[in-house]
Amino acid sequence: MSRPPLLSSACLAATCSLLLGGCVAAGDVRPYAAMAPIVPVVAPTVQPTAGAIYAAGPGLNLYGDRRARDVGDLLTITLIESTTASSSANTSTSKKDATTMASPTLLGAPLTVAGLDVLQNTLKGDRAFDGKGNTAQSNRMQGSVTVTVIQRLPNGNLVVQGQKNLRLNQGDELVQVQGIVRDADIAPDNTIPSSKVAEARIAYGGRGAIAQSNAMGWLSRFFNSRLSPY
């Protein structure tokens, strides 16, 4: 016995809904790829000259501190970023016009129809515009990232780069820092605040259940795009 067409359509719709629901699981539960091994940056070694007493090298500083100064050294950057921006605009315009056209006269008397002055006109115009806009944004980041010196510039400044990857319950958190620091700005404990990093590039992001919950679905992105007719 064949099933009614309406029942078959309902079963097909229910099956499709279950399949689509399984594709939209909460969080990315796929296994993570293995982390790439960290390759340390090592300063090039200078081969000693045969027969020479002294050879070029990093040297040993007996009385100095242990601050980063050479390629491959480590430096801790303290992230203290706080920005607040706000803007507001208010525009209001209005204009009114009024013009009265007198009725023409014939032999000193206005032309009337049933006692009404039908040729007398009054033109009026009234335009008004009122617009307001407000925007505000606030960002704050605190923490620390240990970076590696990848280049020492001729003026003594250090080009640093590093990242921190935290793998939590259902997601990854990644912090990347790049920039240029001065040797004089490095504290005795080999730290420097992020506010003293030139050409700073600080990126913070993540993926997983928390990051996915903050992202719009494909249908919501369509209705918020320029392609949406509404």
Curated annotation (Swiss-Prot):
Keyword Membrane: yes
Gene Ontology biological process terms from the UniProt entry: bacterial-type flagellum-dependent cell motility
Lipidation (N-palmitoyl cysteine): C16
Subcellular compartments: Cell outer membrane; Bacterial flagellum basal body
Signal peptide span: 1-15
Name of one Pfam family that matches: FlgH
Keyword tags: Bacterial flagellum, Cell outer membrane, Lipoprotein, Membrane, Palmitate, Signal
GO molecular function annotations of the record: cytoskeletal motor activity
Annotated Gene Ontology cellular component terms: bacterial-type flagellum basal body, distal rod, L ring; cell outer membrane
Lipid-modified residues, S-diacylglycerol cysteine kind: C16
Membrane topology qualifier: Lipid-anchor
PROSITE patterns, per database record: PROKAR_LIPOPROTEIN
Domain of life: Bacteria
Recorded family membership: Belongs to the FlgH family.
UniProt subunit comment: The basal body constitutes a major portion of the flagellar organelle and consists of four rings (L,P,S, and M) mounted on a central rod.
Cross-referenced NCBIfam families: PRK00249.1-4
PANTHER family membership: FLAGELLAR L-RING PROTEIN
Job description of the protein: Assembles around the rod to form the L-ring and probably protects the motor/basal body from shearing forces during rotation.
Name assigned to this protein: Flagellar L-ring protein
Organism of this sequence: Xanthomonas oryzae pv. oryzae (strain KACC10331 / KXO85)
